[in-house]
UniProtKB/Swiss-Prot annotation:
It comes from Vibrio vulnificus (strain YJ016). It is an enzyme of class 5 (isomerase). The active site is at C75 (proton donor), C219 (proton acceptor). GO terms for biological process: lysine biosynthetic process via diaminopimelate. This is Diaminopimelate epimerase. InterPro entries: DAP_epimerase_AS, DAP_epimerase_DapF. Substrate binds at N13, Q46, N66, G76, N77, N159, N192, E210, R211, G220, S221. HAMAP family: DAP_epimerase. Homodimer. It holds the Pfam family DAP_epimerase. Keywords: Amino-acid biosynthesis, Cytoplasm, Isomerase, Lysine biosynthesis. Catalyzes the stereoinversion of LL-2,6-diaminopimelate (L,L-DAP) to meso-diaminopimelate (meso-DAP), a precursor of L-lysine and an essential component of the bacterial peptidoglycan. Its main location: cytoplasm. It is found in: Cytoplasm.
Amino acid sequence: MHFHFSKMHGLGNDFMVVDCITQNVYFSQELIRRLADRHTGVGFDQLLVVEAPYDPETDFHYRIFNADGSEVEQCGNGARCFARFVRMKGLTNKYSISVSTKKGKMILDVEEDDQITVNMGVPEFEPNKIPFRAKQKEKTYIMRVGEKTLFCGAVSMGNPHVVTVVDDVDSAEVETLGPLLESHERFPERVNAGFMQVVNREQIRLRVYERGAGETQACGSGACGAVAVGILQGLLDENVTVSLPGGDLHIHWQGPGKPLYMTGPATHVFDGQLSC
């Protein structure tokens, strides 16, 4: 099997992007793991696959695979790279691109300054739709994680997120608490774990331990989830800058029942071809 690919990143959250419309490529879980290896493969946090639309009302279908080969529902940084890729490769000349995902639909708007705004949909706080095991919906949940008791928010941005507020994100126990939260029994489909430091009502600092990938330089849906939880808990205003290790994202959300918008860059690194 021979195919072409692009290496891209959104604030350091890096991707291998493959056009599966003009190429016939099949990715097994084993192959994805081999390609994701940073020593012996291409190296990436996620594989993004561009497919022909499943829904006639959309332009493309967008699939996301983590480095461990598991398929996931959403990736915000990947969505921005997806938008740049399909235009760069001549698959569309639209500036507003509609895509379907495993969990729903998204609109990707390419701005004149090469920033890309993604309509991430309406944040979902109902526990059974995240999914999260809880008796009822709350703004804050008490969770026992290892030897610690954490106060967390839970939300779905198309994929599940748990968010805990910390005093200093640099000293947050991401390496130890991240894996424990990711596989916590209250999240039956595992979860992305965000550690949020509130700088002021318009800025947060954030680190994210991603389900199936570990800590990444940036997580778009994690930034969205953190802001949604922060606004719900009364900590943040509707326009927030999220400072991640890889750079800044801008999030706008007017509150429950409204769609959330994420704006940020998408960077093309190189093109390549592989025979597997």
